[in-house]
Regions:
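Bacterial Sec-dependent N-terminal signal peptides
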Residues: 1-24, 380-381
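A non-transmembrane, solvent-exposed segment enriched in polar/low-complexity residues
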Residues: 19-169
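N-terminal targeting signals for export/organelle localization
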Residues: 85, 89, 99-102, 109-111, ...
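N-terminal "domain-start" segment that seeds a small globular fold
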Residues: 224-259, 327, 372-380
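A short, hydrophobic beta-strand/beta-hairpin element that forms part of a small beta-sheet core
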Residues: 246, 349-363
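Conserved redox-active cysteine motifs that mediate thiol-disulfide chemistry
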Residues: 262-263, 270-287
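Conserved helix-turn-beta segment immediately C-terminal to the redox Cys motif
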Residues: 280-303, 379-381
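Short, internal strand/loop/helix patches
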Residues: 313-348, 356
């Protein structure tokens, strides 16, 4: 009897643990009629943006104006969206627990109220704050416009004297509200997205960096944290500044990041198989690498702007672009590569020399000058 009781307890415990690691999204529409047609929503999709691509995580039929998603919760909170409407989507944070969406009008999905879990409750608070800021801004502008003397109505330059200060006041009120919200919820992953979508368009990178520095350690492992750090570094990119971190896959599918080589000099080389000027640099790269045969202080990280695997790998093989200190990576997204955007690459070849601390030393080293510079690193005579 005792064994049966213990077994029952274990079974109940296992079921409870399984439930604890799951999410349920319950959605309800007050109307399922679309905005731009008389048709109704038949199916909705739970989607996530992965490396710039929409990935469908699950689908759900709409029955009696209701839909449900259920599954294993991600280890870290992730921003997702529900699509299937013709006038926008519903954004929410995917995490453990029951997430309630609505009731809402399918014609205006962005107006859906979201809640039920910690992150989504905080996210809804942010949406409410944003709506309140917009409402107050409109009220201030309306009051300013009503205060314009009748004799000045219709005279743009004269009207600006009344309305211009309101733009400034509205901007400052919004900034203060956003900073206060972030400070009040600094431990929540939601603030990562508030920083990205509310701070970056209106704040200087110096101010944004202050708030990024204040984020707790347990948020540093989230992909969005890395994205924020990279965006600030990209905006401030110059000699002496910290380099953005970029990642890609080697030809054999291994994931490699620039930060993997911290403690070494990295010669970051943006190129492509179809780029004739890039190919003209190959002999110089080989010459520089020949000096590093017995040295582990230097790595050449060649990031390809190719979008075709065969073109990339065949070029590497045909030109024997192989050395123990030569690493090749790419995302095969061509000019849409995030790495090219972070380093503001406008043309290739484009090179960046990065020191062991991850700071930019020099841009656009090429030819004999590049060989001489890299040789000095290998020899230990660089300054």
């Amino acid at each position: 009897m005792r064994k049966i009781f213990v077994f029952a307890l274990l079974a109940i415990s296992t079921v409870m643990m399984a439930q604890e690691n799951r999410f349920v999204i319950k959605g309800e529409m007050s109307s399922s009629v679309l905005c731009y047609s008389d048709e109704t929503v038949k199916e909705v999709r739970l989607e996530q943006n992965v490396d710039g691509q929409k990935v469908v995580l699950a689908t759900s039929p709409v029955l009696d104006n209701r839909f449900t998603f259920e599954g294993e919760a991600p280890k870290a909170v992730e921003l997702c969206e529900i699509s299937g409407f013709d006038n926008g989507t519903i954004q929410l944070f995917l995490e453990e627990g029951v997430i309630n969406v609505g009731p809402f009008d399918a014609a205006y999905p962005v107006g859906a109220v979201i809640g039920g879990t910690p992150s989504n409750d905080i996210y809804q608070d942010y949406l409410n704050l944003h709506k309140q800021c917009v409402k107050e801004s409109k009220e201030r502008m309306k009051a300013a416009q009503e205060s314009i003397p009748v004799s000045l109505k219709g005279k743009p330059e004269a009207e600006l004297k009344y309305t211009s200060p309101v733009f400034y006041v509205n901007n400052m009120h919004f900034k203060v509200a956003i900073m206060d919200f972030i400070y009040s919820h600094i431990d929540s992953p939601v603030v990562l997205y508030v920083i990205k979508y509310a701070m970056f368009p209106t704040f200087t990178t110096d101010v944004i960096q202050i708030f990024i520095d204040a984020l707790p350690q347990d948020l540093h492992g989230m992909a969005m944290y890395k994205e924020l750090v990279n965006e600030v570094r990209s905006a401030n990119l110059k000699v002496g500044s910290a380099s953005p971190d970029i990642s890609g896959l080697t030809p054999d599918g291994k994931s490699v990041s620039l930060s993997d080589f911290k403690g070494k000099y990295v010669f970051l080389d943006f190129w492509a198989s179809w780029c004739a000027p890039c190919r003209r640099e190959i002999p110089y790269l080989k010459q520089a690498l020949a000096y590093s045969e017995n040295c582990d202080r230097l790595v050449v990280l060649s990031y390809s702007a190719d979008d075709d695997m065969d073109d990339w790998t065949e070029c590497i093989e045909a030109n024997q672009l192989v050395h123990k200190n030569w690493i090749h990576i790419s995302t095969l997204k061509g000019w849409n590569s995030e790495a090219l955007k972070l380093f503001a690459v406008k043309g290739i070849p484009f090179t960046v020399l990065i020191d062991p601390n991850g700071n930019v030393v020099e841009f656009e080293l090429r030819g004999e000058e590049m060989v001489k510079r890299l040789k000095s690193i290998v020899d230990g005579t660089n300054k």
